[in-house]
Amino acid sequence: MVACSSDDPETDTGNGNGNGGNAEAPYVWGTEGAIKTCDHLLFNDDKTENAKGTVIGNGDQEFIFKGTQTLSKGTYLMKGWIYVGTGSVLTIEPGTVIKGDKDTQAALIVEPGGKLIAEGTKDAPIVFTSEQPKGQRKPGDWGGLIICGNAKNNQGVLNQQIEGGPRTKHGGNDDADNSGVLRYVRV
């Protein structure tokens, strides 16, 4: 594995999901304004970068995911605002659990033109939930799953700002827009 930094142009030879598969996208950092961009957003609990980590984002800043990435079946903790950028695809394998960090109000935001492919099964659904223990979870524990497409919205307004979001807008005139698949997913 190589470092995910702008001064290290090498690429990771794995696909980032821990199974040693072929590289789907390079492992490099970039910036878009004040937001970090990276093909892999996985970290260790101590916020060190790790393409095989179990923490998505580091909670210190927003991230925008670019390229094509697959989250292998497992349990992940999402910290901060994680964006699936325009032209990017995030696939989540069946049986995966993604917990949202309460302190950072973690959210997964699929921007217009980005895709989330989350196809669970009856026996192995994909679950998005609060990191809080069972029985202590409450509305507002985390930011949720936000999918912003280019189709008409119920406000009749093009490019409507998402609630609480500093950058992402939704709505347009493309009613054939496709932001991915949610099947056997519990939020």
Report residues per predicted region:
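Sec-dependent bacterial lipoprotein signal peptides
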Residues: M1-A3
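Beta-strand/loop edge motif enriched in small/polar residues
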Residues: S5-V187
